[in-house]
């Protein structure tokens, strides 16, 4: 009887283990239902200015038909989101942003001359479905302390 119970327990344990190993949605490439983008930001390399330029890598899934990006001061973005809402702001980025011509699995961009705190929003579109991703970049702001002509003596 004890052998029978042990074998039955082993069969139940094996069955429970096998049935618990189901594939979760979104883990297999090509099964996504909505467009998606992941934004990676890097320090810009020469000849760009690493203090005020940012390099971005955009990773798109296979459902993306078109993509747009908009870089603006973080305070301006916050005020627009407060008045328009998230969906309205995504529409704003699509209509006023820059269209990314080549939507490959990975696309690289370099944004230049960014002084202060910026929010970079990327919106991806598939039909009437939209998804956005945001990254922030803070570029150095320079302020003149003294104006005038400087003379240096060489000895």
Question: Which residues are covered by each model-predicted region?
Answer:
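Ser/Thr- and Asn-enriched, surface-exposed coil loops between beta-strands
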Residues: 45-57, 103-107
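Beta-strand-rich modules
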Residues: 112-131
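Extended, solvent-exposed segments with strong compositional bias
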Residues: 91-101
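Solvent-exposed loop/turn segments flanking beta-strands in beta-repeat/beta-sandwich domains
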Residues: 54, 58-89
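Bacterial Sec-dependent N-terminal signal peptides
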Residues: 2, 15-46, 140-153
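Surface-exposed, short loops/turns at beta-strand junctions within beta-sandwich domains
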Residues: 100-103, 108-117
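Bacterial N-terminal signal peptides that target proteins for export
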Residues: 1-9
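Edge beta-strands of extracellular beta-sandwich domains
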Residues: 131-139
